[in-house]
Amino acid sequence: MSSMFVYVWGTVTDLLHSACSVLALNGDTESSGEHTAPGDTRHGHSSCPTDSRAMEEEEFEILLPEEPEEGTSQDPSPDRSGGFLGDEGTLQTLWLILVGKSGSGKSATGNSILGRRVFESKLSARPVTQAFQQGCRAWEGRELQVIDTPDILSPWAAGWATAQGVGEAGTGSLPKQYAVLLVTQLGRFTEEDQQVAGRLEEVFGKGILARTILVFTRKEDLDGRSLETYLRETDNRALAKLDDVCSRRHCGFNNKGDGAEQETQLRELMRHVEGVLKEPEGCAYSPPATPQPHAAPRESWGLWWLGAKEGRGDQAWLWGLHRILKEPEQAGRQLPPSTPI
């Protein structure tokens, strides 16, 4: 009987001890909840109900992202312009040569391509661009070298090139990757524009127009119509013929547009440039060897047509172009960041 009492008493004691332990544990839990509100992040931790295992897995996913799927390529590091560097960390260079008559919007188009104001552009009775100018930017894996040229028909064009020492330029070849952009104003394609196209063939040789892109400024004047429709319905036969000769590579530019619009315009232009680079013999051009010209007398610097008849005008413009093309190669280039115009 006594042994039975001892057994029962021991069992009751064990049960009471277990109950006290449970009550103490619940009290600690409630006390902890009184001092920490949901969402409190004191001591660097969040008290939101989060499973510790789930949190560890989430942190692991952030630190170690999933491996790319098989067959997908890993792009190299992007540059500041959104483009990508080459295998050796250098950008491929592409030259864009702007040509056209005075007032066509060459300089403004160059600024739109560069994404910032580099070339002087304003309304003037006298040609604003009287010298070959150069600007550059990085764009999607390429270094774009933009050349703004004097009016190829202007009397100041030959004068500047000769004064800068045409004889120093020497013979040579244009860059391996380049495109000629013939800039004209929408709705104002005149006989002078036809002369520009003819002068291009005189300077660069037959076939250059097949690797030239027509760039129409004042795209906003289309009032919602497409450039394709405008060119298809134009009654300007000279313009229609030139468009055909240029393999119908054309695009429009609104040089007053915002950044997004100008980026879209640049992408369309570059699509045509890629087509030019795929043309047979379109990636390189070497001018024929000619006697090295001597500086003309100052009195004749302004006589463009006289220079052309004597074989100096075309050479002066071409040698001026060669000079500006060589200058960036002789000195280290630093690509300025693209900033709004």
UniProtKB/Swiss-Prot annotation:
Span list, region Disordered: 28-85
Domain AIG1-type G: 91-294
Cellular component annotations (GO), alphabetically ordered: cytosol
Residue ranges, annotated region (G5): 254-256
Region of interest (G2), residue spans: 127-131
UniProt GO MF annotations: GTP binding
Keyword Phosphoprotein attributed: no
Ranges where the record places region G3: 148-151
Primary localization: cytoplasm
Residues noted as binding GTP in the record, renumbered to the chain: 100-108, 121, 218-220, 255
Sequence segments annotated as region (G1): 100-107
Subcellular location as annotated: Cytoplasm, Cytosol
InterPro entries named in the record: G_AIG1, GIMA/IAN/Toc, P-loop_NTPase
Annotated keywords: Cytoplasm, GTP-binding, Nucleotide-binding
Keyword Nucleus set for record: no
Region (G4): 217-220
A Pfam family matched in the record: AIG1
Biased composition (Acidic residues): 56-72
PANTHER family for the chain: GTPASE IMAP FAMILY MEMBER 6, GTPASE, IMAP FAMILY MEMBER-RELATED
Family recorded in the similarity comment: Belongs to the TRAFAC class TrmE-Era-EngA-EngB-Septin-like GTPase superfamily. AIG1/Toc34/Toc159-like paraseptin GTPase family. IAN subfamily.
Protein name, UniProt field: GTPase IMAP family member 6
Protein species of origin: Bos taurus (Bovine)
Lineage: Eukaryota, Metazoa, Chordata, Craniata, Vertebrata
